[in-house]
């Protein structure tokens, strides 16, 4: 829009044209106020009824909330106004009239159920809180990319349509691909390993993953954003170091560049950048500490995966981000390298006190051992021939991890439900919008 001024840039003494949504109208008799909202904030528009054209006043005061308008006029200093300035209008033009009955209140004065908010996402994102979450999300992804570049990693984009699942199993969305069965990719794991085996060496990807899991919890999605790293000539400890750097960089960027957004969410004082290095607990130590809390009905034994209540008990005990290392080889994927004893793997998880954020480890780069890993987990190596054949041509030791982008944001901002961190979430019940 030509000659438009954002509300945050309107200065006393200027003649401006501002455009946005009608946030609120207050009629006090001889004088009335309209609050106009745009992406940068709000500005007050003053109507002095006895001194203005009747048609101008009627247009400004009878327009429904959330209608889209432009206002042209002079900016004056007014300490009592929400932003210290106000506009005396010369013209008001209604660009799009809103219904008088709205499915939710973007001002936040009336609470709405999450399902109502997601069904009416455009309206929901007009709230300060909704806008703040996704501005912070954008800053997180910007900082993550910068941290990866600082770690000498190159951004890649891998296929999301595959012939076989990354980890086998049934948690795949099947599709028809020119008459053949194919699947939506559940992870870029195998692809990023193949690229790390080239001269590029260190790679990262930020992209969607699809998992046909029938979970219906506040922390699971069927389409999510995965932040992935893979590095040649890296072991599992190197990968954990990069993970710490990336996660900490995201927090630091938000703390420095998103103070207004954090204030809108009411978490300015509670927001803390994680201390490094993150504690590193072995799987065995994790089980011992969980059992010692007495929070579980039954004691965990070697080989058990950690239940949700166990993760929570351990998170409360540790009190910050931490790693769990040296998992039993039998409960980690086939591509994770084992330690020399064969009982423990190089796999690790990075945890927030509320939940798991990252899964990673050193990968098996020796072809014969990799094939054996397939067979031990009941997978057919022939189905992954495109992957295994590249290990015949010299595959360096390599390690990496995958981080759930929405989980990172959810835990960073203490959101109640992971769906709040997604524009248009996909779960078992939601396919639209």
Swiss-Prot record:
Main location: cytoplasm
Aspartate as annotated region, ranges: 189-192
GO terms of molecular function: aspartate-tRNA ligase activity; aspartate-tRNA(Asn) ligase activity; ATP binding; magnesium ion binding; RNA binding
Site positions for Important for tRNA non-discrimination: 82
Protein EC: 6.1.1.23
SUPFAM superfamilies reported in the protein's UniProt record: Class II aaRS and biotin synthetases (SSF55681), Nucleic acid-binding proteins (SSF50249)
Residues reported to bind Mg(2+) 2: 356, 359
Gene Ontology CC annotation, any one: cytosol
One Gene Ontology biological process: aspartyl-tRNA aminoacylation
Keywords assigned by UniProt, alphabetized: Aminoacyl-tRNA synthetase, ATP-binding, Cytoplasm, Ligase, Magnesium, Metal-binding, Nucleotide-binding, Protein biosynthesis
CDD domains attached to this UniProt entry: AsxRS_core (cd00776), ND_PkAspRS_like_N (cd04316)
Pfam family, one: tRNA_anti-codon
Cofactor notes: Binds 3 Mg(2+) cations per subunit. The strongest magnesium site (Mg1) is bound to the beta- and gamma-phosphates of ATP and four water molecules complete its coordination sphere.
Binding site for Mg(2+) 3: 356
Organism superkingdom: Archaea
Family matches, as PANTHER family: ASPARTATE--TRNA LIGASE, CYTOPLASMIC, ASPARTYL-TRNA SYNTHETASE
Described purpose of this protein according to its UniProt entry: Aspartyl-tRNA synthetase with relaxed tRNA specificity since it is able to aspartylate not only its cognate tRNA(Asp) but also tRNA(Asn). Reaction proceeds in two steps: L-aspartate is first activated by ATP to form Asp-AMP and then transferred to the acceptor end of tRNA(Asp/Asn).
Protein name per its UniProtKB record: Aspartate--tRNA(Asp/Asn) ligase
Organism: Natronomonas pharaonis (strain ATCC 35678 / DSM 2160 / CIP 103997 / JCM 8858 / NBRC 14720 / NCIMB 2260 / Gabara)
């Amino acid at each position: 829009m030509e000659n438009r001024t954002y509300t945050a840039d309107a200065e006393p003494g200027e003649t401006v044209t501002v455009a946005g949504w009608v946030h609120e109208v207050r009629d006090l008799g001889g004088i009335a106020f309209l609050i106009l909202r745009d992406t940068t904030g709000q500005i007050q528009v003053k109507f002095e009824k006895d001194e203005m054209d009747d048609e101008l006043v009627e247009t400004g005061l009878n327009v429904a909330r959330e209608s889209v308008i432009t206002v042209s006029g002079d900016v004056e200093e007014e300490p009592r106004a929400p932003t210290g300035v106000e506009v005396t209008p010369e013209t008001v033009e209604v660009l799009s009239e809103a219904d008088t009955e709205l499915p939710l209140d973007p001002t936040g004065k009336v609470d709405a159920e999450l399902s109502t908010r997601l069904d009416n996402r455009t309206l929901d994102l007009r709230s300060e809180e909704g806008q703040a979450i996704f501005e912070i999300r954008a800053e997180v992804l910007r900082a993550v990319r910068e941290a990866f570049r600082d770690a000498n990693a190159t951004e890649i984009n891998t296929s999301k349509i595959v012939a076989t699942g990354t980890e086998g199993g049934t948690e795949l969305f099947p599709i028809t691909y020119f008459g053949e069965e194919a699947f939506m990719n559940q992870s870029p794991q195998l692809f990023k390993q193949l690229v790390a085996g080239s001269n590029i060496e260190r790679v990262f990807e930020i992209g969607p993953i699809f998992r046909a899991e029938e979970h219906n919890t506040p922390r699971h999605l069927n389409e999510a954003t995965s932040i992935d790293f893979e590095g040649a000539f890296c072991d599992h400890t190197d990968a954990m170091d990069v993970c710490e750097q990336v996660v900490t960089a995201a927090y630091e960027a938000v703390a420095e560049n998103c103070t207004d957004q954090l204030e809108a969410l009411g978490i300015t004082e509670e927001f803390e950048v994680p201390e490094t290095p993150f504690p590193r607990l072995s799987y065995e130590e994790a089980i011992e500490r969980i059992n010692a809390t007495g929070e579980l009905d039954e004691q965990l034994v070697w080989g058990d995966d950690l239940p949700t209540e166990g993760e929570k008990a351990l998170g409360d005990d540790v009190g910050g981000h931490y790693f769990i290392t040296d998992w039993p080889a039998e409960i980690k994927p086939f591509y994770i390298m084992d330690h020399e004893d064969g009982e423990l793997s190089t796999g690790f998880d990075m945890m927030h006190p509320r939940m798991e954020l990252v899964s990673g480890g050193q990968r098996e780069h020796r072809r014969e051992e990799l094939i054996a890993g397939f067979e031990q987990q009941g997978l057919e190596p022939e189905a992954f021939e495109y992957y295994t054949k590249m290990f015949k041509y010299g595959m360096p030791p390599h390690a990496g991890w995958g981080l759930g982008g929405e989980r990172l944001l959810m835990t960073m901002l203490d959101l109640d439900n992971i769906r709040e961190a997604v524009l248009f979430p996909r779960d078992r019940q939601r396919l639209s919008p």
